[in-house]
Amino acid sequence: MKKPFYKVLYVQVIFAIVVGVILGHYYPSLAVDMKPLGDGFIKLIKMVIGPIIFCTVVTGIAGMQDMKKVGRVGGKALLYFEIVSTCALVLGLAATHILRPGVGFNIDPATLNGKEVASYAAKAHGQSSVDFLMHIIPNTMIDAFAQGEILQILLIALLFGSVLAHLGERGRVVTDFIDGITRVLFGIVHIVTKLAPIGAFGAMAFTIGKYGVGSLVPLLKLIGTFYLTSVVFVLVVLGAIARFTGFSIIRFVGYIKEELLIVLGTSSSEAALPQLMEKLEKAGCSRSVVGLVVPTGYLFNLDGTNIYMTMAVLFIAQATNIELTWMQQLTLLAVAMLTSKGASGVTGAGFITLAATLAVVPTIPLSGMVLILGIDRFMSECRALTNIVGNGVATVVVSAWEKELDRAKLRAALSGNGEAAAGEAARV
């Protein structure tokens, strides 16, 4: 029996977002007080992200038997991430050259006050490549889970799963126990997800109430350029990859619409991570691939952030009438490929990575970031949406490369008949 439309989660989330926008516009002081609703929902989701990643990766690797496969899957995922991330960076650069959203501002860099972005610049200079690599190793196992550090948890899970795979039948009891914990954790996610409309309402009301719709007007061209470029990236770049793999990007986006709406309402791609992992398994991707690709993708495959990076730098250059040589732009691409890695989960990640990138192109003033500080919050939704679609597609692609994609389940899921096909398992 079909649910009444008002009981469907994505309908509830859409309604909550609309109400949040209305409240934020007409009653901004009250709307700002709604912030704890959004923050609380995201905290509830983050509460289970670490344990879910640990359990999913451990059970996936423990069932692989062949440990060479773990390295193979990881290698293929990283290769895919680099290729697609580069496409996103180049597309952001090309779109800004074509649409020229910064032309006409004629801003004198000397008049810009960089105090508002000083904290982001300090964070950007504060972490070197060595610091980043050392940060992957936790002080203790407990500390990794307590801090919610995805890379650290992933490292622990890889080691734990590898040992269980080596033990074979002797480790079966532990593997079965962790698998049972996984089911409990996803049950918790189902309960928490029902609160998504409340979280989306609170986050959207706060955003509109604090920043106001009026703050968008002067920079609408940049916002429009970014949103348009992201749509083109999803439909053309990811669409071509999806078609080559044997599925429709439009149907895939429709399949994860609830997760996308949660991301839209909360501006956090992490808010939908557990649900995305579960849906990808239901769509025929193997648990081992989902467990490895999705968490690493949230750190190394930030397509939306990559588009934003090159676009923001070139926008600042155009707005301040600074001409960049092709060599400087190629340097920008190379640096952005490095600075964007591992940015997910860091407060103000977009601005921190942008500051790190600008530091390598000294002709563009760091204070130019002030120009987009006010609208960054409105662009974060698009970044997060593009990131989650990109990671979903990446997981399906790597599963197909590994011949661990159940195409019968995938077709059924994307056509809306996932449950009916649940029993069909024809690995291809």
Swiss-Prot record:
UniProt main location, coarse: membrane
Pfam families: SDF (PF00375)
Origin superkingdom: Bacteria
Membrane topology (UniProt): Multi-pass membrane protein
Transmembrane segments: 8-28, 44-64, 78-98, 148-168, 184-204, 222-242, 307-327, 355-375
UniProt cross-references to Gene3D superfamilies, sorted A to Z: Sodium:dicarboxylate symporter
Subcellular location(s) per record: Cell inner membrane
GO CC annotation terms, alphabetical: plasma membrane
UniProt KW keywords: Cell inner membrane, Cell membrane, Membrane, Symport, Transmembrane, Transmembrane helix, Transport
Entry keyword annotation includes RNA-binding: no
Any one GO MF annotation of this record: succinate transmembrane transporter activity
PROSITE patterns named among the record's database cross-references: NA_DICARBOXYL_SYMP_1
Gene Ontology terms describing biological process: L-aspartate transmembrane transport
Function: Responsible for the transport of dicarboxylates such as succinate, fumarate, and malate from the periplasm across the membrane.
Family: Belongs to the dicarboxylate/amino acid:cation symporter (DAACS) (TC 2.A.23) family.
Designated name of the protein: C4-dicarboxylate transport protein
